[in-house]
Amino acid sequence: MAAPLLKSSECEGVALLGDPGRPGGVTLAFTGRRGGVSEAPFDSLNLGTHVGDEPASVAENRRRVLAAMGGEELLGSLVVPNQVHGIEVRVIRDGSPASLASARQDVARGCDAIVCVVPDVPVMLCFADCASVILACEGGFAVAHSGWRGTIGRIAGKALGALCAETGREPGEVSCYVGPHIAGIDYEVSDDLLRRFVAEFGERVVAGERRLSLLEAIRSALLDAGADASMIVDSGISTATACDRYFSYRESGGKCGRHGAVAFMRR
């Protein structure tokens, strides 16, 4: 079982960070902000419909991402949830049009992780400082949004448990990827919030005075859920210091686009 890795690539101007090994037959990628059609302050590959960008621009950007990943023809099956900074995990088990319509209605009511065990159904979640997590194994994948609320609620571990329950795989077999997010050294939080994280995960989450490492908390949640340490890989990119390549809510003053975490399987 090969260890996961994240490698940069580019297709028609769209920069992707993914695993060319396609673990379990899963195509996965974290997107950046370049290669799209959106105008400032959403320039240019904004994937979020909730930020004030032109809907047509977002639709074209999403098409470009799937095309760059080799799945443009799957655009009509794309599932994008309404992220609410919670810990709800939803599962997609049926890719028929009626079932997908029902799934879209379900995730529109709010969820922050989706497990998918059917082929040809891409899942996309959107980010701008919060941590993105993709899990992949034979038979399925999960994409999760892990901001501080989701992280302290162990959403990555919950998604791992749900994925394994659906696929019958062991947690240690799952490839785990943490995408670009605000790194601990850049993430200043209140003393109270830091204390809450230390109580939940231990001192490893402290990245400095009033600095919180979401990565270490996510790693702990995954390990506690049974993940193999060698199967967890981090992008090593902080959105706060890579604003030319990724969107950062904090650095932009709250007005910006959203990059994405995307995954799908093939028949």
Model-predicted segments: where are they?
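Active-site microenvironment for binding and transforming phosphate-containing groups
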Residues: 1-267
